[in-house]
């Protein structure tokens, strides 16, 4: 049986990336709370470095 999680980097960036977060009010709230908490990576694309840009 095939498992449900079949990872794709492009899909991951597009759904959970920095620009996607910035595009909605709640997404910006997510980024703000992660900044406040001091997270090392704010979003998937920012964690991927230059590959996500």
Curated annotation (Swiss-Prot):
Basic residues composition bias: residue spans: 1-19, 26-40
Entry-linked InterPro entries: Ribosomal_bL34 (IPR000271), Ribosomal_bL34_CS (IPR020939)
Keyword terms, alphabetized: Ribonucleoprotein, Ribosomal protein
A GO CC term assigned to this protein in UniProt: ribonucleoprotein complex
Domain of life: Bacteria
GO MF, any single term: structural constituent of ribosome
One Pfam short name: Ribosomal_L34
Region (Disordered): 1-53
Record field: compositional bias (Polar residues): 42-53
GO BP terms in the entry: translation
Family designation: Belongs to the bacterial ribosomal protein bL34 family.
Designated name of the protein: Large ribosomal subunit protein bL34
Naturally occurring in which organism (per UniProt): Chlorobium phaeobacteroides (strain DSM 266 / SMG 266 / 2430)
